């Protein structure tokens, strides 16, 4: 069986709908079972309530991202890292808009999300491989676990999470997909459904094959109604830059999509 792992939807309803439709299409063909989300359901696009409602309607369990927990607890800032004063300003605008427009029931749903989830595909026996889900890292959901982190850093995080040889830990937050194995543990960044930053505008998620042992890790990209998302942002009071970022896949020079 394969698990579908999605992360960083960021209120992009058209992207989420397309990803869930793709997962549904693969259920029998690719033996896709449960779907889990790795947080940051809200922020940056105008559908926070609709995204959280759809996640709950579909019975998709998951964890809190930094955006979810800060909105739910009325913090002053989302805990996002900005690389310029302008980016910091945009971050504050998005966070303020989300807090102002989110419904009480949505806020409550975000508040109920746990920090971490541990899954055992074949029962609860500790000899089975474990899949651990966090948003940023086992220590902080605001920590950026990028692909250039050292093997020693990965080993430290695995030890902190209590992982053993054959286990897998999945996370998001950076919006850039990658995977590697260090000391027998698989490390997987799922990328982003609703706000990719790797130059590819398409929504991204991961399929993890899990049984007696962890098998393949497949990165999936899905085209969605980008113009609907762009139009939704432009019709809201959110900055037009967020629409431009969606078109460019989060980078000034988007990659060529095959």
What kind of region is each of these model predictions?
Residues 1-4, 119-132, 182-186, 215:
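Beta-strand-turn-beta hairpins that frame and shape the catalytic cleft
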Residues 1-60:
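N-terminal active-site segment of His-dependent metallophosphoesterases
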Residues 6-7, 35-40, 61-66, 134, ...:
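Active-site neighborhood of phospho(di)ester-bond hydrolases with catalytic His/Asp-centered motifs
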Residues 10-15, 43-46, 67-73, 168-181, ...:
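Active-site environment of divalent metal-dependent phosphoester hydrolases
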Residues 23-32, 121-128, 161-165, 207, ...:
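Glycine-rich phosphate-binding loop signature in dinucleotide/nucleotide-binding domains
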Residues 51, 58-118, 128, 140, ...:
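Active-site neighborhood of divalent metal-dependent phosphoester bond hydrolases
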Residues 148-188:
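Anionic-ligand binding region
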Residues 180-258:
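Acidic, His/Gly-rich catalytic cores of divalent-metal-dependent hydrolytic chemistry
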């Amino acid at each position: 069986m394969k698990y579908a792992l999605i992360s960083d939807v960021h209120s992009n309803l058209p992207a989420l709908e397309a990803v869930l439709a793709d997962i549904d299409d693969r259920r029998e063909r690719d033996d896709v079972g449960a779907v889990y989300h790795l947080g940051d359901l809200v922020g940056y696009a105008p559908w926070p309530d609709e995204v959280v409602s759809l996640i709950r309607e579909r019975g998709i369990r998951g964890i809190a991202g930094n955006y979810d927990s800060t909105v739910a607890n009325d913090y002053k800032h989302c805990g996002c890292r900005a690389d310029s004063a302008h980016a910091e300003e945009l971050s504050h605008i998005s966070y303020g808009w989300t807090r102002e427009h989110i419904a009480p029931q949505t806020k409550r749903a975000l508040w109920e999300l746990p920090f971490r989830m541990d899954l055992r595909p074949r029962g609860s026996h500790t000899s089975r491989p474990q899949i651990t889900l966090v948003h940023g890292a086992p220590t902080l959901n605001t920590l950026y676990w990028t692909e250039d982190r050292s093997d020693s850093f990965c080993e430290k995080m695995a030890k902190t999470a209590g992982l053993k040889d054959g286990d897998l830990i999945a996370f998001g937050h950076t919006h850039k997909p990658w995977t590697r194995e260090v000391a027998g543990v698989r490390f997987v960044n799922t990328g982003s459904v609703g706000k990719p930053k790797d130059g590819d505008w398409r929504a991204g998620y991961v399929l993890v094959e899990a049984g007696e042992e962890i098998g393949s890790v497949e990165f999936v990209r899905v085209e969605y109604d980008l113009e609907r998302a762009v139009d939704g942002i432009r019709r809201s009071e959110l900055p037009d830059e967020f629409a431009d970022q969606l078109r460019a896949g989060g980078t000034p020079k988007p990659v060529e999509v095959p």
